[in-house]
Amino acid sequence: MSEVTTAEFNEEGKYLRKIRSFVLREGRLTKGQAQAIESQWPTMGLDYSPTPLVLSDVFGREADTVLEIGFGMGASLVQMAKDAPAQNFIGIEVHKPGVGSCLSDAAIAGVTNLRVYHHDAMEVLEHAIADGSLARVQLFFPDPWHKKRHHKRRIVQAEFAELIRRKLKIGGVFHIATDWEEYSEHMLEVMQAAPGYKNQSSDGTVVPRPDHRPLTKFEARGHRLGHGVWDLMFERIA
């Protein structure tokens, strides 16, 4: 097993240190997930290296590239890749069954424009993604760490926003979604204060769910129960 680190920040979003947050668990794979990893990793898997990817080499073409941090089981990421064949997609996930499920779904869907990391997202972003190379970064339903004493563990902080800004092209978009209203308010505060971004919301708050983000079964059930989901989209302008 590989140990994974993640950044910790203070209340002002100042980087403090890297902490051991969890272990990159093998997880309990189904037979289908294990088979998908074995058969699909050679073509869709990306082995981490601390040198920037040459995206045109990875995908065999020049195209806008979308990166998703923490894709879970991967169903929505595969759907996005299928719906937008002219774009390239990279997903990062630490949970191995999720990686296996994503690769299985991708193979069934026949997508060729998707690549996957099984690694810590902070390391991938810092070292394996070139500055100014991404058209969109997606962070959907990150852990809200709702207890106040855990807020410093929230991924959306000032230095993280700056890291994402560096990786986006001018005109690229950081798209965040959460089902925790207080976290959406925290995210909005962080992003409004982050230099080099422009909120794509007409009223300076959140945006309606864009067509490119699929409506998940979990989210649809939440809507029926009256639960909200908040989307934020910030464009890199400098």
Curated annotation (Swiss-Prot):
Gene3D superfamilies reported in the protein's UniProt record: Vaccinia Virus protein VP39 (3.40.50.150)
InterPro entries registered for this protein in UniProt: SAM-dependent_MTases_sf, tRNA_(Gua-N-7)_MeTrfase_Trmb, tRNA_methyltr_TrmB_bact
Amino acids binding S-adenosyl-L-methionine: E68, E93, D120, D143
Positions that bind substrate: K147, D179, T216, K217, F218, E219
Pfam family, one: Methyltransf_4
GO cellular component: tRNA methyltransferase complex
UniProt keyword annotations, A-Z: Methyltransferase, S-adenosyl-L-methionine, Transferase, tRNA processing
Pathway annotation: tRNA modification; N(7)-methylguanine-tRNA biosynthesis
PROSITE patterns to which the protein is assigned, alphabetical: SAM_MT_TRMB
E.C. number(s) listed in UniProt: 2.1.1.33
Annotated catalytic residues: D143
GO molecular function terms listed in the Swiss-Prot or TrEMBL record: tRNA (guanine(46)-N7)-methyltransferase activity
Reactions that this protein is recorded to catalyse: guanosine(46) in tRNA + S-adenosyl-L-methionine = N(7)-methylguanosine(46) in tRNA + S-adenosyl-L-homocysteine
Recorded family membership: Belongs to the class I-like SAM-binding methyltransferase superfamily. TrmB family.
Family matches, as PANTHER family: 3-DEOXY-D-MANNO-OCTULOSONIC-ACID TRANSFERASE/TRNA GUANINE-N 7 - -METHYLTRANSFERASE, PENTACOTRIPEPTIDE-REPEAT REGION OF PRORP DOMAIN-CONTAINING PROTEIN
Purpose of the protein: Catalyzes the formation of N(7)-methylguanine at position 46 (m7G46) in tRNA.
Protein name from the UniProt record: tRNA (guanine-N(7)-)-methyltransferase
Species name: Shewanella baltica (strain OS195)
